[in-house]
From Swiss-Prot:
Residues bearing PTM 6'-bromotryptophan: 75
Major localization listed first in the record, in broad terms: secreted
Propeptide: 19-49
Family indicated by similarity: Belongs to the E superfamily.
Gene source species: Conus marmoreus (Marble cone)
Domain notes per entry: The cysteine framework is XXII (C-C-C-C-C-C-C-C).
Superkingdom, taxonomy of origin: Eukaryota
Annotated Gene Ontology cellular component terms: extracellular region
Leader peptide range in chain numbering: 1-18
A molecular-function term among this protein's GO annotations: toxin activity
Name used for this protein in its record: Conotoxin Mr22.1
Localization terms from the record: Secreted
Amino acid sequence: MMTRVFFAMFFLMALTEGWPRLYDSDCVRGRNMHITCFKDQTCGLTVKRNGRLNCSLTCSCRRGESCLHGEYIDWDSRGLKVHICPKPWF
């Protein structure tokens, strides 16, 4: 019974709030930033505020695809720089 209640509450939350996002507690980033890690290569995101590097994230990703997918990202922010997988691949 409790399992059914848990799943019902989880899916209700998913419908109203959206699926839970992945966050890195050590980093300061825009809301709802989502990180998807794959294999093969590395990529990352760096954030600079007032000329200082606050956060550097790296993860593995599939060739040719971005590691970082997001919703409601402030792309106009001058301090945000997104790196996709490096080329050429080895």
